[in-house]
């Protein structure tokens, strides 16, 4: 399918699932989805040609548990109002197992195809067990809003392949149910990996590669269990990487590069002095060597000065 998103769909008020992924829809994601389809639990529009911004009306979908807008051309910032997605922000424990409640009538069971933990899995289970948000591979800019940390019911989060900047919000570490902080990779994030990430005890997938992150990788059973590839393309140190840190938490190779640069400045100072001497010396000698008339004049002058000096010295002795 291609073209615009059909507006006739807004008449299906009882819809709880829209999956129009891998089509050729274009234009903006319709704002009326949040206005009219208030019972939506799953919204998957991945792998289309949607552009424009994420409509703030999406934040009105209080039952939404699976939002997938990945692989489109969506720009703008991540809406701060995402913390209003109450089904992603609420947890209930039943027999020590965490579920997310989204309707008073109970939990709806659906056969849902979701992209989770870096692979496609088909779940015959309550939707409350697979709450996820994937807005990867777009052109989103700005910072990750700290309000994302309120979505404590999320099990999977993927913001990779955008143009996001700034620090990673510390309160993402409060999302202790997170199993798959699938990807913050391939952005322009800076600062440190928040120490609170050591609280994410259920993580089985994690990737912050190819950003501008610096400092130490927080110590936890989970964070040290991932491969180096989860951290490459940054300026990080400590296990699982082989780079050690200085006492200030700076990777040693970065610190050494700084020292090398300072040493290079000193070396260049000496080099410039030597070059200055050589250039000055040859600036005087080269004309005498190559121009015969200058050479003869120089020797006559030198002979004249020598004779004059000798006469002065001899006169002083008398």
Residue ranges and their predicted role:
Residues 1-318:
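Membrane-proximal ectodomain caps of single-pass cell-surface receptors
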């Amino acid at each position: 399918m291609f073209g615009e998103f059909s507006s006739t769909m807004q008449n299906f008020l009882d819809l709880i699932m829209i999956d129009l992924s891998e089509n050729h829809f274009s234009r903006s994601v319709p704002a009326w989805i949040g206005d009219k389809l208030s019972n939506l639990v799953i919204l998957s529009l991945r792998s289309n040609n949607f552009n424009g911004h994420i409509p703030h009306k999406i934040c009105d979908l209080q039952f939404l548990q699976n939002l997938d807008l990945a692989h489109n051309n969506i720009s703008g910032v991540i809406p701060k109002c995402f913390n209003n997605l109450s089904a992603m922000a609420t947890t209930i424990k039943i027999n020590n197992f965490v579920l997310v409640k989204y309707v008073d009538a109970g939990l709806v069971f659906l056969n849902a195809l979701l992209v989770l933990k870096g692979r496609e899995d088909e779940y015959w289970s309550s939707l409350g067990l697979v709450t996820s948000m994937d807005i990867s591979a777009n052109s989103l800019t700005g910072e990750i809003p700290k309000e994302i940390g309120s979505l404590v019911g999320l099990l999977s989060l993927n913001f990779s392949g955008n143009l996001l900047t700034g620090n990673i919000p510390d309160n993402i570490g409060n999302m202790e149910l997170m199993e798959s902080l699938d990807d913050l990779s391939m952005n322009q994030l800076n600062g440190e990996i928040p120490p609170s990430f050591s609280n994410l005890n259920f993580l089985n997938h994690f990737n912050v590669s190819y950003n501008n992150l610096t400092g130490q990788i927080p110590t936890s059973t989970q964070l040290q269990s991932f491969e180096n590839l989860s951290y490459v393309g940054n300026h990080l140190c400590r296990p699982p990487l082989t780079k050690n840190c200085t006492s200030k938490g700076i990777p040693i190779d970065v610190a050494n590069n700084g020292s090398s640069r300072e040493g290079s400045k000193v070396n260049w100072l000496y080099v410039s002095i030597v070059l200055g001497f050589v250039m000055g010396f040859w600036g005087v000698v080269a004309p005498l060597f190559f121009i015969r008339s200058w050479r003869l004049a120089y020797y006559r002058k030198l002979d004249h000065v020598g004779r004059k000096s000798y006469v002065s010295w001899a006169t002083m002795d008398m």
